[in-house]
Amino acid sequence: NLAKKYPNLIVDNSHSFFCKPLGLASFNSLRKFFNVQNGAYLFTSKQLEQVFDVDKIELQPVSMQENYEKFLKNELFLDSQKQIKAISPKVEKMMNDIDFEAESIKRVRIFKQYEKVLKNFNNIQLDLNSGDIPYCYPFSPNSEIIKRKLWSKNLVLLQLWKNFPKSFIESEFLNDTIALPLDNAEYAEKIIEIIN
């Protein structure tokens, strides 16, 4: 119904990389799902005649902490950019080397590992439907002890909605939610070990 009302509708699948395009214009995010620092895939039924400049951001793979810091800096940089660019050749090669089937299986497996251990400590009750490939495991700890344990270990803990305005009813929930990544089995084991 929205597509009928708004003919120029664009679907933001930045947290749904594996979601199939539904005929509407949509985009997803490479860097939110994979260890690359730039790029997205744009899907549209229209043929684009324009040739886009190539993105020149080239960051080397580093530690998770350094990568997260570079991710945040890159986020600010991308917010200042107002044009579409083609992804860099380096990122394109990295994406071509990814086994997407194996990646999706790994994400579901790690999600289920988190859910098995964390569900009793999570304010969010989750159901993963068949065919869903999640971006993260959203963890909203229901205990201050667990929160302190996690923060004391100096792990990179992503908060997607950090500092959400307190005037919104959702602020307490969103400010407390940690997006546990699903692309690193060793990281998941550390989180589970800390909480157990």
Residue ranges and their predicted role:
Residues Q50, N142-L150, E186-I191:
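Short, conserved charged micro-motifs
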Residues G23-S63:
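Active-site PLP attachment segment
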Residues N1-G23:
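Catalytic PLP-binding core of fold-type I/II PLP enzymes
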Residues K166-N196:
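PLP-dependent enzyme catalytic core of the Aspartate aminotransferase-like
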